[in-house]
Amino acid sequence: MEYFGEFLGKYLFYIWLGLAILLFTFLITRGKKVLKQFVDIDFNKIVYSEKNASGHVVRQTQTRRAGTTKMLHIIITDQELIFKTNLFFAHIAHENDMLHRIPLGNIMQTEFKKGRFSSKLYVKFRTIHGDEKVVILQSKNNLRMQSILEQYI
């Protein structure tokens, strides 16, 4: 047992560093794979864009508790509503069902709710597979986003 303690004391930093590099590499490679769906965004047709928003999907028990906090990039083009995030957190956002490309014609309803400390925008939409989802967004300009999205409902 003494030998294990000496070994751990001597090599703990290198073990920790190796695990950190493995985790970092995993998140980057998975993030690149997940973000391939956003490669062809035409940035000349952006109507609205906001970084550092928060949100979560209300569909399953697991995703009600999980979401993204201050890492969501919301983009509205003339044809799509896009939720994406940066490379490092893309895998986590994908696992929490927060990466979407929604044609504006698939948006069914938006609802603005003013809270005590912040406001929330509920966006109900139909996925490509026909499922209905609701995303709750917390951003700086929820009313502006709602007015843009209401034009397409």
Q: Where does each model-flagged region fall?
A:
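Eukaryotic phosphoinositide-binding membrane-targeting regions
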Residues: I46, A53-G55, K140-L143, I148-Y152
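Canonical phosphoinositide-binding patch of PH/PH-like domains
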Residues: F125-I148
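Generic detection of short hydrophobic beta-strand segments and adjacent strand-loop junctions
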Residues: Y48-K51, H100-I102, V134-S139
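Anionic N-terminal interaction surfaces
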Residues: E2-D78
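Phosphoinositide-binding peripheral membrane targeting modules
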Residues: A66, D78-Y122
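Short, mixed charged/polar active-site loops
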Residues: M71, E95-L99, G130-V134
